Amino acid sequence: MAGGNERSIKALKEVWRRAENSFCADCGKPDPDWASSTLGVFICLSCSGIHRNIPSISKVKSLKMDHWDDAQVQFLANHGNAVTKATYEAHIPIYYYQPNYSDCQVLREQWIRAKYERKEFTELGKQLPYHDGVKEGILWKRGRDNGQFLPRKFLLSEREGCLKYFTKQDAKEPKINIKIDVINATFQPVKIGNPNGLQITYLKDNKTRNIFVYHESGK
Ligand SMILES: [Zn+2]
């Protein structure tokens, strides 16, 4: 704690030691040693890297190496993981998958941005476009040519009765848009090499097409 005075170091340790702050606010990893001085959350090193990508929302500092002044320590004391969670995670849809520390960076970044940057869960109904029987999530899809798995946004719409997926995170038009009633999905852990592997088969132009996907959690 270079340069810090003893009183603020002591106060910082007291806040840090609270049970609510002993797990990363974003992925649940034990013993976080970073914190956001603007959001007031205690986070792990890995999630602090994601926070650093959204500097307009979050300023991260090491709890061990950086100096925290009295006002910043007071801010952490007034916020902390429990209070901040009550605000930013107030209304998470039941189908929303909350990543943990074993999940990949892509999933965690999506979660962190949804939570703090887009504030999707602060108010009831903010997720309205998705509420209408629509499930959205990231699945790892095998590329047709090189066989490599890449994360892709998938959308399942009950109202429209179709499954769509997008090659780009912010794409407006889906790469495919298939009617659910022509889809056949089977679990194929061996074929795909993942316990949560799924083969989606559908008909297009009278030809059978296959998509191979998996999700890390199996949800
Ligand atoms: Zn974390």
Where are these regions (language model features)?
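Short Cys/His-rich Zn2+-coordinating modules
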Residues: A2-K10, C24-K29
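Short, flexible, mixed-charge glycine/proline-rich loop motifs
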Residues: A11-E20, D33-T38
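Short cysteine-rich clusters marking metal-coordination/redox-active sites
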Residues: C24-C27, S36, C44
